[in-house]
Every structure is written in structure tokens, then in C-alpha cells.
Amino acid sequence: MEKVAVIYEGKYGSTEQYAKWICEETSGDLFSLEEAVKIDLAVYDAVVFGGAIHAGGILGIDKFKKIFKKIMDKRVYTFAVGLNIDDEEARKECIELNFEKQEYVVRKAVTWVFGRRIPEAEVRFGKLPCWFFKGAYDPARITGADKTVMGVVKKMIGGKPRSERTESEQQLLEAVENGADYVDKSYIKDLVDAVKGI
């Protein structure tokens, strides 16, 4: 039986819940990203990393990228958890920001500075598959910078006339104002099937 490691980085529990469900379905081992950086992942056949989406970035992606260099010969899958994942443009921007753009910037820098090809780990990282799962938002639990960011989101979307808001923007605004829990185990099916090779 193949060994699967599931690694997560989140703030409020949704990402961890998805990671636990993926572990259940794959008989995998669960690790927080903090734990994962301390262990030898080479003993695993497949590695799944999931992070919460925060201002377009996937939490922990930079740390995971360092881990990836050691496990790039394994089967690696990623997932991101957020409120606005129904918006195709938001998903595309998330992929570009966290995978493709990083790979592109590194490639340009390496080529310009050293006049050589980009390292294989960078190329592969830029092409990792990523699944998107809907998260939860509880205004009462949000503090600090997160509260400020969500206040800005509320102002930006709420400042538009209702007729000009997209459906996903309206749903996001309602979630920010009232809270929402979209966490649903059914989201993991395609990722689990990929890990199992189905």
C-alpha cells in the first residue's frame, strides 16, 4: 500500500478539516507544515499540501516550496481553501501568484544573472496541480490584519451597485458580513481520486 503524507497550513480550521478528510480517504499521515519541515518525507509515495488562501496567496507555499525540492520525484498534489473559489478569475490569479509567477520570476532571474537554465525543481513546482475547496468565515473569530483585509474587501464589493456585482462577489460580501461555512467533504473527491490513481 502506498504511503501518503498530507500537510496543511491554515488559520481558522477549514484547511485542517479538509486535510483530515483527505487522510481518512487515503489512509495517509497528517502533518501541520511546522511538523512536516522536521520529518523525512522521502519515505512517502505521495505528498499532498494544502493551504488557506489569504489575500490571494496560499499560506505556507514558500515553506512548502523548500520541502518540494527534496520530494520532487514523488507524486505531489496541492489544494487551496478560500471563500471566493467559485470565481474562475480568482482561481487563475491564485495559480499564477503561487505557482506560475514564482517559477517565471525565478527563471528570468537565473537566466539573466547566471545565463543558465532554470533548476528542474522550479519548473516542476510551477506545474503542480491544485484543487480549490470552499472554506468558512466567522467574523467573530477574525482579528488583526485579517480583520482589516476583510474590511477592505467589504468596502470594495459593498461600494459597487448591486447590479454590477458578480454572483461570486455578492456571495463573498454576504459571507464577510454574516459569516459562512461552505466546508464540504465532497470537494475532496477529485483530489483523493488523483492520489489513489483512480
Q: What is each residue range found by the language model?
A:
Residues M1-K74, T78-F79, E103-Y104, K189, ...:
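N-terminal beta1-alpha1-beta2 submodule of the flavodoxin-like/Rossmannoid cofactor-binding fold
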Residues A55-I198:
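FMN-binding flavodoxin-like domain, especially the glycine-rich phosphate-binding loop
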